[in-house]
Amino acid sequence: MANFINMYRQLLSLPLSALVKNNPIPANPIEELSLNIHQPIVYVLPYTSQTDFVIFRRNCLALGLPDPAEKNEINGVKLPRYVYLDEGRRIFKSKGAKDETTTIFNKYLELHRTSESLDVQLIPVSVLWGRSPGQEDKSDLPNLRLLNGIQKTFAAIWFGRDTFVRFSQAVSLRYMVVEHGSDEKIAQKLARVAKMHFAKQRISATGPRLPNRQAMFNKLLQSEAIRRAIEDEAKSKNISIEKAQKEAYKILDEIAADVSHSSLRAVDRFLRWLWNKLYSGIDVQNSNRVRKLALEGHEIVYVPCHRSHIDYLLLSYVLYHQGLVPPHIAAGINLNFWPIGRMFRSWGAFFIRRTFKGNRLYSAIFREYLSELFHRGYSVEYFIEGGRSRTGRLLAPKTGMMSMTLQALQHSQTRPISIVPVYVGYEHVLEVDTYAKELRGAAKEKENAGLVLRVIKKLRNLGQGFVNFGEPITLSNYLSQHFPDWKEQNHEEKPQWFTPAVNNISKQVMININKAAAVNSMNLVGTALLSSRQRALSREQLLEQLSSYQQLLQNVPYSTDVVLPNVTPQAMLEHVLALDRIGVLIEKDNFGEIVRLERSSAVLMTYYRNNIQHLFVLPSLVASIILHYEAIQKDLLLDAIRKIYPFLQGELFLHFNEDELNVQIHQIINEFARQSVINSNDNFLSINKSKVRILQLWSAGTREILQRYYITVTILQKQPAISRAELEKESQLVAQRLSVLHGINAPEFFDKAVFSSFIANLKEQRYFDESGYTVLDKIEELASTLSHLISTEICLTVKGTIEKSEDLSS
């Protein structure tokens, strides 16, 4: 019989290799699932299928996993390397798969009793033939059930390119023996647990059935909240109930997605072509976190940072290829233009207006629609920043969607809701040229199909894209920890804890996004070149600086989730030089090569520097203090950092608390000393003159931030009673003048939002009294600290401009 099965598998192998593509999930199971290939592995499959076996085996061999067709040999005993939990619809029958599997499990357990060093790993594996969840009003089932030979043939032809082999987290048999013993009941329990795992996996791979849009509309329009809103609309506008109902239907039709699985399959093919045209690859990290939440039955809300319109497509594409369900995506109403709007809607987009203010009917309908998505178990994605960042930094969170998410949790949400922060990064953003024009004052160009096609047509060879899933926030756990009485409040009204909870969770999402930053060659090369006042460095200086950056990021990690480039400084530079439309040039003179950034590209490059500015701001501040003082006691350096840190923390969403900050600063000092960038003797720090250029380049990372802070506190010294609005306006005007006089190219330098954030942080840190008047002694102390870290030339320009402004206004 074994020979017949082998012949049958060989016959299947040729057509399947032509029809079915290798799509393993995860892409690198050995690394991502922490598999120990030096210990025996047993693959656990849900049911007998020779077709599935051939596909699964081919993936194993391509991934460097042990061949499932061969046997494990342990202490002279040979046992199968795979088991089936159930009979499938197969030609070759044998004794029951259940009994056979239990017998094999028992033999492996017996070997664990006699060999203490043995640790067999059980790896659940399933082959997913297509991912359609089916429709609510139809009886069709997803193609994850048992298929007979004819059905498998059609599945291979139709779904061959969409067939995935899913490897799950291994179960340690050694752990099972230690925790539960090794009798026959344990073998049966293992089989039951594996069956439950496969059942959950089916749901996590396809998601709930797609809704009947009309039936969903009818249900929502009958909900109490929307009926009340329709009645209020009719009264307030003096129109009939029927007319108000038509308006409600029109709003719902404008908002709601119209997901089509066939459309998702089509866009998957388009996106494969697009990524191959534009990018050299998509680097995905920590997707196991999300798969774990999906298997545990969590309602998942993806909250990515927003760099580009292409973010909408990228995250859905990545999730689909990680064996997860693409989410329903909250997209700006500006993207609802022909034909893109209809296409996006079929891919899961639901559209949201820029503001709900004053429109109670729209607000009620949108809130109920979002709550219905959660209730039905669909994953959701929204961009908490509200729009795309034009500067490359995270924007302050807009809390409206988070507020509605918490309201859904309040109102009878039975499944746990987990927020998954997502860092999305690119070595070249499609719209970066447009952002630069907008920051220089150009009007925002309205989105249309022609604009999208023109942008894509012009671009290629844009390097890599990055998606890193940050630390999830399970809302019920977070609320229980920080707001213990959240369940006891009256759910009909907004309780006292609600607004602080929304604000705190939104801020924590931003912090977790920054903790998951993916550093790339563009970020590092751009940071180094922009740190030089002339935007140019010798090749040797640049490589030395890149090495210093790399060493510090590795030896003093910002967080365990940060992803670092695993290449040499030389390779980083060559990679950036090979990218299109970057503006990094090589010039030669008698002394060697100079790497220079074109002036016109300086604003573009600040975008990529700003992506990782939060990683470098503390080392930069340490470098800046030591450089300006030349020699300083550690205690004094720490005091200066403690004064400035709350403002950096608020602006850049840094995650260190007071104790963690002290540890991080000491580690940075030790790393600078290890690199010989500074001298460290007991409590005394000083510059190392032979490496002062490295320290200068490090210090540049906070140069413009400290200058901005100094502008605002100097105005407050001169005008302690100035209003907040006037303070923001005058700070912005002084910064604009400073940028012209001193050639500052950073687009955020005179951005009103960063001054608004700094002033809000001043208030939070009690630099204003209850009446809003400046606490002068605190402001003067902060101004004194800042003035020691800013060049005399800048200080004089700031003071002179403020005095001139006073003279003009008096």
Curated annotation (Swiss-Prot):
Which GO terms of type biological process are on file?
Answer: CDP-diacylglycerol biosynthetic process; fatty acid metabolic process
Motif HXXXXD motif, chain ranges: 305-310
Q: Which GO terms describe its cellular component?
A: plasma membrane
**Its membrane topology:** Peripheral membrane protein
SMART domains attached here? PlsC
List the keywords (alphabetical).
Answer: Acyltransferase, Cell inner membrane, Cell membrane, Lipid biosynthesis, Lipid metabolism, Membrane, Phospholipid biosynthesis, Phospholipid metabolism, Transferase
State the InterPro entries in the record: GPAT/DHAPAT, GPAT/DHAPAT_C, GPAT/DHAPAT_LPLAT, GPAT_PlsB, Plipid/glycerol_acylTrfase
Q: Which EC class is this protein assigned? A: transferase
One family from Pfam that matches here is GPAT_C
A Gene Ontology molecular-function term?
glycerol-3-phosphate O-acyltransferase activity
Domain comment quoted from the record: The HXXXXD motif is essential for acyltransferase activity and may constitute the binding site for the phosphate moiety of the glycerol-3-phosphate.
The identity of this protein, by name, is Glycerol-3-phosphate acyltransferase
User: Which organism is the protein's source?
Assistant: Haemophilus influenzae (strain PittGG)
| Gene that encodes it | plsB
